[in-house]
């Protein structure tokens, strides 16, 4: 009995121990000084009865990344270069909290990578060959990735299998790059001031490590240029006269004072960030710990312990000394979105040959939404002679995110998504120009013809004679998808203006609005794919998705009203669609609801519509605009409406089902005539309307992009 009691006591104690471990955030320290500070943090949090934190020590950021991925630790603060590494397989970590810099009045979650030199010299950024260089550390953002990416054209490096470190070792006469292999690349460690095993170490045991160390390397006269961040000079030199002895090298091969960093920097890069596991990452616990820690031990909060401070002789332990707080990173943001396409691509390019970099720059990667679009895209890619390749995602917003990260380059979007993409920094490049219903003859000037927009309409069965715009409340509704123009933004924007209520799931009795919560009324009418899977997903796996899907929802008597565009009914009735559900449908069996309470035939949409909507448009990043335009205009000359290889080989504007990649009634992709921002393209009235509607609910991607603009 006594033995049983002891066993139970032991198991209870073990359970309490494990429960404590589950509640506690295990912080990973990358050096002994960091571990010492971490234990001080732990003791001070305990004193104020704050959230528990425990500490483990590893010898490098990569070891901490591995420990977190293996669930042996929970969090570590990383520079952007290691955020990139942490986001890769097999680790798949993501940033959960960003360090905030600046002031309380002007906080920012970015900093500037700069090249600092002593005044008096005459060399410029393009004249560094043969000089001596000081770096914060191998693979770090300001000290390695950004400057080496900037200098790559001068390095005489053709790419792998030779490591880029070899080219850098040849380029500079001597360097200090903490973390470099001093056996393989002795020149990269020649300037370092550490002794014995600590020479060139990736830790504070190397005096020239990190920002202050690299700047010290320059100040001591060891190096000619230091690659650091803009704040280092101000943090390490409080005297203005001393700061005046240094200046910045600018990308335009001029020099500027150190306080002109906004006009003279190598790159603007995201803050250091705390990373955690993408799945079961204790994000809430980590944020609660950081929030309370900054409240108790932030700037000027406590004389006993400084969260953003380091002991004399040390710098930036656990967090940057210049940080003023943390900002929680929205859950939609992974490492690629956090770093941005420019920096993300720059790091990748440091690992590719010149030929690979040039080939990627020339190629357009199209993003396909869902399996059906991907099949069509792969067919296009196979005939494009390498000009176009494909990536895919399950939703439009996921595709927009791939374009933002540089993993894809372009896609054609409905106006509602053009708004989202524009808010995230993408731009319209070409617009879908639609065939005129009045004429079937091709327009030789289609590419230069200004786009007119299309009509968003509410379609009902002609037999439902009592149904008008004024009586749609409580009926069953069919929508193209949430956030799309004709199917959501316009009708729901009108209803919001009428009712002032955001409870759209209560306005109609049941709906199919792909992209909604599958458990809500807004998905009740959706049917998914042939196997009954993928119900309410915002792609073509949901049979009631898109213009054709929403009309099918009405035609099959699931819904009472369908919100589509004016040509949708024409394209799917009177023999224009041979699919089983549509082949017997008659145009005359449907009618339009007018805003004045009247009803009219479908052919009279000009005088009975909800609003004029902007045409779909191709969007991309600014860096890809010209190449994308060149490729698409060439591709439509071959595969467009009257292309040389359509219909014999492939047609861009025809689909196995309906409206895959582009709308099937697209006549051509047309120039924008100056409407090259989302605001200009969509027009002020539409932008104002959708901005108003977003008060009801924003999307995770919009929330993420709002954060990234800070």
Swiss-Prot record:
Domain of life from the UniProt record: Eukaryota
Positions of region (Critical for glycosaminoglycan, lipid A, lysozyme and DNA binding): 20-24
Residues spanning the signal sequence: 1-19
Site (Important for iron binding): 229
Listed GO CC annotations: cell surface; cytoplasm; early endosome; extracellular exosome; extracellular region; extracellular space; nucleus; phagocytic vesicle lumen
Binding site for Fe(3+) 1: 79, 111, 211, 272
Binding positions for hydrogencarbonate 1 per the UniProt entry: 136, 140, 142-143
Mutation effect (residue 140 to D/E/S): Disrupts anion binding site and destabilizes iron binding
UniProt keyword Acyltransferase present: no
Post-translational modification (record): Poly-N-acetyllactosaminic carbohydrate moiety seems to be needed for TLR4 activation.
Protein name listed in UniProt: Lactotransferrin
Upper taxonomic lineage: Eukaryota, Metazoa, Chordata, Craniata, Vertebrata
């Amino acid at each position: 009995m006594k033995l049983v009691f002891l066993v139970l006591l032991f198991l209870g104690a073990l359970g309490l121990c494990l429960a404590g471990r589950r509640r506690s955030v295990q912080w990973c320290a990358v050096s002994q000084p960091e571990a010492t500070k971490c234990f001080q943090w732990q003791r001070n949090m305990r004193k104020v009865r704050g959230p528990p934190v425990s500490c483990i020590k590893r010898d490098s950021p990569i070891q901490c990344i591995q420990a977190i991925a293996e669930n042996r630790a929970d969090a570590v603060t990383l520079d952007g270069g290691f955020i990139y590494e942490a986001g890769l397989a097999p680790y798949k970590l993501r940033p959960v909290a960003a360090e905030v810099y600046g002031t309380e009045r002007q906080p920012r979650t970015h900093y500037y990578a700069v090249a600092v030199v002593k005044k008096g010299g005459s060399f410029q950024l393009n004249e560094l060959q043969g000089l001596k260089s000081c770096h914060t550390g191998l693979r770090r953002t300001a000290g390695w990735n950004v400057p080496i990416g900037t200098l790559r054209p001068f390095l005489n490096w053709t790419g792998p299998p030779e490591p880029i470190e070899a080219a850098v070792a040849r380029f500079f006469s001597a360097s200090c790059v903490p973390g470099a292999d001093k056996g393989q690349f002795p020149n990269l460690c020649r300037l370092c001031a550490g002794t014995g095993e600590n020479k060139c170490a990736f830790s504070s045991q190397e005096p020239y490590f990190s920002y202050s160390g690299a700047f010290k390397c320059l100040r001591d006269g060891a190096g000619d240029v230091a690659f650091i961040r803009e704040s280092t000079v101000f943090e390490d030199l409080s005297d203005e006269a001393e700061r005046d002895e240094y200046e910045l090298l600018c990308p335009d091969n001029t020099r500027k004072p150190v306080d002109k960093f906004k006009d003279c920097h190598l790159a603007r890069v995201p803050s250091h960030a705390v990373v955690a596991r993408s799945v079961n990452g204790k994000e809430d616990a980590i944020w609660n710990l950081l929030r309370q820690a900054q409240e108790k031990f932030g700037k000027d909060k406590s004389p006993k312990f400084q969260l953003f401070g380091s002991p004399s002789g040390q710098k930036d332990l656990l967090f940057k000394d210049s940080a003023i707080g943390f900002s929680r990173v929205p859950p939609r943001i992974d490492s690629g979105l956090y770093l941005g396409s420019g920096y993300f691509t720059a790091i990748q390019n440091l690992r590719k040959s010149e030929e690979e970099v040039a080939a990627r720059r020339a190629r357009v990667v199209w993003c396909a939404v869902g399996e059906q679009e991907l099949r069509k895209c792969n067919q296009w890619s196979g005939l494009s002679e390498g000009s176009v390749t494909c990536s895919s995602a399950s939703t439009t917003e996921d595709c927009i995110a791939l374009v933002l990260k540089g993993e894809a380059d372009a896609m054609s979007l409905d106006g509602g998504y053009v708004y989202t993409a524009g808010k995230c920094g993408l731009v319209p490049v070409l617009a879908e120009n639609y065939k005129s219903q009045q004429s079937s003859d091709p327009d030789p000037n289609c590419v230069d013809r200004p786009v007119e927009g299309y009509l968003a309409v509410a379609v009902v069965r002609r037999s439902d004679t009592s149904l008008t715009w004024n009586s749609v409340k409580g009926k069953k509704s069919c929508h193209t998808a949430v956030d799309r123009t004709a199917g959501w933004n316009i009708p729901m924007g009108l209803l919001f203006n009428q009712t002032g209520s955001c409870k759209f799931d209560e306005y109609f009795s049941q709906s199919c609005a792909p992209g909604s919560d599958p458990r809500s009324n807004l998905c009740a009418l959706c049917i998914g794919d042939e196997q009954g899977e993928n119900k309410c997903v915002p792609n073509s796996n949901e049979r009631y998705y898109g213009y054709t899907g929403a009309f099918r929802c009405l035609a099959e008597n699931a819904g009472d009203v369908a919100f589509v565009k004016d040509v949708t009914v024409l394209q799917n009735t009177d023999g224009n669609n041979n699919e089983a559900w549509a082949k017997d449908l008659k145009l005359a069996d449907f009618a339009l609801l007018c805003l004045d309470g009247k009803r009219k035939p479908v052919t009279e949409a000009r005088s009975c519509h909800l609003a004029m909507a902007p045409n779909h448009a191709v969007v991309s990043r600014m860096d890809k605009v010209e190449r994308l335009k060149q490729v698409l205009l060439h591709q439509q000359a071959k595969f467009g409406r009257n292309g040389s290889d359509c219909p014999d080989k492939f047609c861009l504007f025809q689909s196995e089902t309906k409206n895959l990649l582009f709308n099937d009634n697209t006549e051509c992709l047309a120039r924008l005539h100056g409407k090259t921002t989302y605001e200009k393209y969509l027009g002020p009235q539409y932008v104002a309307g959708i901005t108003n509607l977003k008060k009801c609910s924003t999307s995770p991607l919009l929330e993420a992009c709002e954060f990234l603009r800070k």
